[in-house]
A protein has these predicted regions:
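ATP/NTP-dependent adenylation/nucleotidyl-transfer catalytic domains that generate, transfer
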Residues: 19, 24, 160, 219, ...
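Enzyme catalytic cores with a strong preference for nitrogen-chemistry domains
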Residues: 1-354, 370-379, 411
Length: 641
């Protein structure tokens, strides 16, 4: 299991006939063959799929139980040449009791049998009438499919390095699901064989339950429930198939479909292992109880280059418009509350913000305005300073002024050309030398102005730099890298644009809305080099360091998922198919890796700022990294691509 840590799993929902074990086994065998063709490595069928769930008292009859045993044995034999592991539901006799079981088998060998722990006997459920609970069963063996196999509720399995566990239907709905302990015992994938009937409103709760359990266990959770063919005497089974991973639903079946369904997804075991390593609370309970681990190596099946998994090219930005709007509102609240507390603590009566007419300073000013409203302070106490330099264009200059007017803040204009020209003379820099000193001197001059005005006014300098700039080190050390409180420090550039768009959409003043929309359409630039012959922006950030949508994708997957360059490239190729080719992605991935390591010294000295999402580079919080760490291993991996 070395396919970048991905494991292809499936919930297989076959047509069933109640009590017709031969037919049911045939359908399951056919679906197993289809799963193998699609490269599935582990597939689960519904609860009691060999007999069907709705047999009622017939399940106590020896005739049906014998037929189930024989059909299960044929199913194990029929799939013995397939390179995948299967999990089928069947009623099995053990001692004097009958158990509702999940049978795990591969290559003609039964690896183990897991009995259902929680036997529901309420509402429409009467399972206690037929089945015994598997609670407490451990270290036992059971006769199944002509073999002797391990039998117990505590079994975990490891096939080709992929660790998984099994529970059945009601087990998930209980206060202490067996899957929680299975996960603590090492299972990164949980399969649930279910036969859960429909009821109005129940499906939404089921989705939440599956997603939540996958999050709580930091695992992949594959839920496979009975569908077409179960008896509708009193109940309806819609055929729910859900694949979730650490709180996110990856794939779902079509409910109430008359067709057989194979719900396939690639789950990311590498990501799950990373999350468990970083989650100290999870580690505190690992291995708390002893359990039986059954290991097996089997030939690998077909593997496709394209993953059965949606790869989000914008991982920081919610896809759904309603969710995105809600997220933007929440982020603004976090930013403004963070700034409000800092202003109260420092007794700052005013805020000073450098306004360039670009996205970041616009967001910082919007946050500051909300902060003053929250504190019931006059927005006139916000001092917005525009500082035209050698590269300032009419478009950004006018947008800066219009934005400040629209928000009702105090406007100051302090050009920096003369001060920088004098500074160039003082240090002996030829103004025609447009290197780092030429650019950075302007950024530091602006920061000096902001700091000095803040001292004069008893105010606080609000920083504008964003998370993407911090990751790339695209900021002047002790220039725009420095402030007294950085409200955008954990907001990536791709999200900044959406936050400003949300502000525009909720802005009542038409002129201010128009200004915000034009700022969104303006190319990202530090404007430290002179404009072109037409007075337009000549220095475009994304031409120099690469597209921010790529860098934010790299950043999220590097930090939040712990991936290396090879896996990030694989995912980026799929996420940005049709937008960027492999060579382009690899070029900017190399830039990202190199700059991320070499620019850590700027992050080590970054000012305070609020964390707003799952990724932050604060050296006091989420990211602890020495400024002189070597990037050799990561760059070597890039070079090998």
């Amino acid at each position: 299991m070395d396919n970048f840590g991905f494991l292809k799993v499936a919930a297989a929902i076959p047509h069933l006939r109640v009590g017709d074990c031969d037919y049911n086994a045939e359908r399951m065998a056919a679906m197993a063959e289809e799963a193998a063709r699609r490269g599935v490595e582990i597939a689960a069928f519904p609860e009691l799929g060999v007999t069907a769930y709705t047999c009622g008292d017939l399940v106590l009859q020896s005739t049906l139980l014998d037929a189930a045993d024989e059909a299960l044995e044929r199913l194990v034999r029929a799939t013995r040449k397939l390179p995948l592991t299967l999990i089928a539901g069947a009623p099995l006799r053990h001692g004097s009791a009958l158990y509702n079981c999940a049978v795990v088998f591969t290559q003609g060998k039964v690896l183990g049998v897991v009995p259902k722990t929680y036997i529901p006997n309420y509402g429409e459920f009467y399972e206690n009438r037929w089945f015994a609970s598997g609670a407490g069963i451990s270290d036992e063996h059971i006769a199944v499919a002509g073999q002797q196999a391990d039998f117990g509720a505590d079994l975990t399995f490891e096939v080709n390095g992929a660790e998984f566990g099994v529970e059945l239907c009601e087990d998930l709905w209980s206060a202490a699901p067996p899957s929680s302990q299975l996960a603590l015992n090492g299972a990164k994938v949980i399969f649930n064989l279910s036969a859960s009937p429909e009821a109005a409103g129940k499906h939404a709760y089921l989705r939440q339950l599956v997603a939540q359990q996958s999050a709580r266990t930091i695992a992949a959770y594959i839920y496979c429930s009975a569908g077409f063919g179960e008896s509708t005497t009193d109940l309806v089974f819609a055929g729910n198939g859900i694949v979730a991973e650490n709180g996110t639903i990856l794939r779902e079946a079509e409910r109430f479909s008359p067709e057989e369904q194979l719900v396939v997804a690639d789950v990311d075991l590498e990501r799950l292992a990373f999350e468990r390593r970083r989650n100290t609370s999870f580690r505190m309970n690992e291995g708390a109880t002893e359990n039986t681990v059954i290991e097996m190596e089997i030939p690998e099946g077909l593997r496709g280059v394209v993953l059965d998994r949606d790869i989000d090219p914008m991982p920081f930005v919610p896809k759904d418009e309603a969710h995105r709007s809600e997220r933007c509102e929440e982020i603004f609240r976090i930013q403004s509350h963070g700034l409000a507390q800092r202003m109260i603590h420092t007794r700052a009566g005013k805020a000073v913000v450098g306004i360039s007419g670009g996205l970041d300073s616009t967001l910082a000013l919007l946050v500051t305005a909300r902060t003053f409203d929250f504190l019931k302070m006059d927005r006139a106490g916000i001092i917005g300073i525009t500082m035209p330099g050698f590269g300032t264009t009419d478009r950004t200059y006018n947008n800066a002024l219009e934005l400040m007017r629209g928000l009702g803040v105090t406007i100051r204009e302090i050009p920096i050309r003369d001060a920088c020209t004098q500074h160039f003379r003082d240090i002996g820099l030829d103004p025609d030398d447009r290197g780092a000193a030429y650019e950075n001197a302007q950024a530091r001059e602006r920061t000096q102005i902001l700091m000095d005005v803040a001292n004069m006014e008893g105010g606080l300098v609000v920083g504008t730099g964003d998370l993407s700039e911090l990751a790339l080190g695209w900021a002047t050390y002790n220039g725009d890298q420095m402030s007294m409180y950085g409200v955008n420090a954990s907001v990536p550039k791709t999200l900044v644009r959406h936050l400003v768009k949300w502000a525009a959409d909720t802005e009542r003043d038409a002129a201010t809305r128009a200004t915000l929309l034009d700022i969104i359409d303006t190319p990202v630039s530090p404007e430290l080099l002179p404009a072109d012959a037409e007075g337009k922006i000549a220095q475009k950030t994304e031409d120099l360091v690469g597209p921010y949508e790529l860098h934010d994708f790299f950043l999220y997957n590097f930090l939040r998922a712990g991936y290396g360059p090879a896996k990030i490239l694989l995912l980026a190729e799929q996420a940005f198919e049709g937008s960027y080719d492999r060579a382009t992605i690899l070029k900017w991935l190399t830039v990202f890796v190199r700059r991320f390591f070499t620019q850590q010294f700027k992050r080590s000295a970054m000012p305070d700022g609020p964390k707003v999402g799952s990724v932050s580079l604060s050296p006091r919080g989420d990211w602890r990294m020495p400024s002189d760490a070597s990037a050799a291993a990561w760059l070597r991996e890039v070079e090998e691509l």
